[in-house]
């Protein structure tokens, strides 16, 4: 079991559930824009927010943001150790640093002293793009062992100053290297791991890489907190992270829609129906629907359709221009093809209201 780390009022590690994080892409000094994005992220289900703090203007913005919000806020620090100290003074619930790029042991000692004094945890965040020169020289390129060595070396530096309120991340944009590096550190350290695939890319490719990289780690029981990194609106990261956790059975929340791939037996426009069910289910969740771990099955024919539909909370098995609705394993009624999506979502809503 991993060590417990408290970030504001949120626990990471130990027996705590896996938390979902994101990072604002607004300038931190633009307080109003950043607060608007934080509110959207919170509404989507984000549990920890990270903000960049590159200079004094950002520090002052960070201070005001902390005054306005309750969600745990992490300060992301690079190069200038003084910004880490200033961010802690401004109320940071955690700081993220790469000890190797803030200017030597004395600077790290100063940051650690302030963090210990204020009971603020530190994430040691190592990336494939910023490995130490001696490690790159030893391995010739970015490797899993090199990433793990860098992370553990920097953790040891914090421990040298009697600091152990630590979270570790070691991210690569290469899914296999990323996976192997986390496995190494997971076996060699009891600090909680912040998992993700860095620079995953645009949503189309980034979601594939994140599903493979993060999903593989989660299936092995590795990871205490996670961020899906996408070149997109950060809110999209949260939606995908929640969907990933639900798909793996780690969280039971929201509405999960499953549908068959179709074949020559399909006699309805199943793709259109499934997309409409997903759209309506999404709208229902956005409206504050309180359902937990609901599964909807949209099936195209009589081969697997009735069985799959009965296994789901709600489902439809389609025939020629129509569908047979199921709820909680029981047959409900037949409906016309054009009414399937509406009637299926109505079943969900009616059960909730009954």
Per-region residue spans from a language model:
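N-terminal amphipathic alpha-helix/helix-capping segment at the start of soluble metabolic enzymes
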Residues: 1-22, 116, 279
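Active-site mouth loops of central-metabolism enzymes
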Residues: 15-33, 52-54, 71-79, 135-148, ...
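Hydrophobic faces of well-ordered beta-strands that scaffold small-molecule active sites
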Residues: 18-24, 49-51, 73-77, 95-97, ...
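Glycine-rich, proline-tolerant flexible connector loops at the mouths of alpha/beta enzymes
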Residues: 25, 30-31, 42-65, 96-104, ...
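Glycine-rich phosphate-binding active-site loops on the catalytic face of alpha/beta enzymes
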Residues: 47, 91-105, 197, 220-234, ...
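Alpha-helix-loop-beta-strand connector modules within alpha/beta enzyme cores
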Residues: 55-77, 110-122, 182-193, 280-281
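Hydrophobic or amphipathic alpha-helical targeting/insertion segments
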Residues: 82-123
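Catalytic alpha/beta core domains of metabolic enzymes, predominantly
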Residues: 127-130, 135-281, 289
